[in-house]
From Swiss-Prot:
Family statement: Belongs to the DEFL family.
UniProt-listed GO biological process terms: defense response to fungus; killing of cells of another organism
Disulfide bond residue pairs: C40-C79, C44-C67, C53-C77, C57-C78
Pfam family, one: Defensin
Full protein name: Defensin-like protein 44
InterPro entries according to UniProt: Defensin-like_dom
Keyword Signal in annotation: yes
């Protein structure tokens, strides 16, 4: 009986501690870590491909870049 009472008390303390903890870290706003200005500037071509695009993006402070050909980008070098 004493073990059950101790176990229930410990369980209630854990539940109470978890409910009183600050969980705002999980609900915090996601903010971009890099630059957020126009990320698709240069047009890609036969001479300006993924390699040059990635190099230019790294020089501009982005982590990477590649040529995107889908309709909203229109064959531009987009940095990420």
């Amino acid at each position: 009986m004493a073990i059950t009472k101790t176990s229930v008390t410990l369980l209630l303390l854990i539940i109470m501690a978890a409910s009183l903890s600050n969980f705002s870290v999980l609900a915090s706003e996601i903010k971009p870590t890099g630059r957020v200005d126009n990320q698709c500037k240069e047009m890609c071509s036969a001479t300006f491909g993924d390699g040059k695009c990635a190099a230019d993006c790294r020089k501009a402070g982005f982590s990477s870049g590649r040529c995107l050909t889908s309709s909203p980008f229109g064959n531009k070098c987009c940095c990420t």
